[in-house]
Amino acid sequence: MLARFITDTINKEQEFLMQAIDDLTVSDLRWQATPEVNPIGWILWHMFRVEDTWVQFFIQNNLEIWERQKWNEVFDLPLRDNGFGHTPEQVSNFPTLDLAKLLEYGAEVRTGTLDYLTELDFNEFTVIPRERRPNITVADVFRQIVGECYQHTGQIAYIKGMIRGANAFPSDYTAPN
């Protein structure tokens, strides 16, 4: 039941995310209100990388999809980078990634997450996957993923609104059902 709730929650977030990134331009992906503000393209990449790291590496002790499917080579980016600790200069100099390819990577990550959730037994949510991090259970990881996904999706929608003002979303926009 908990796995179903988490699945529904992240699927709903995905709907919000797809609405927020609909019709973005390359310029929109790179736009920064100030040099210290993360642009939409960087936020998207970071979201997908963090989910990949948490589920594949931290919980399951697998190679990340980023490495297994050689997405780091597709984007010509470092193997172990996920954005944590980036300086404003690194964020400003981050390359503009092809949105379609980035979304393809994100879809692979989400599929991996959902596949793992479908196999997860309720009691496994209390498992501590890493001895060196004894205070983090599988449930804690999913709480973090859900929180980060919604937070970053909100940031993306807000930035899009800053760029486009009243035209950020169509006049017939409604929240996903």
Task: Report each predicted region and the residues it spans.
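A generic alpha-helix structural signal
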Residues: I21, L44, L103-G106
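A generic structural signal for well-ordered alpha-helical segments enriched in polar/charged residues
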Residues: E15, Q19, D23, T53, ...
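Glycine-rich, flexible loop/turn motifs
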Residues: T25-S27, W71, Q90, D121
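Acidic/histidine-rich alpha-helical segments that form the ligand environment
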Residues: P78-F125, R143-I145
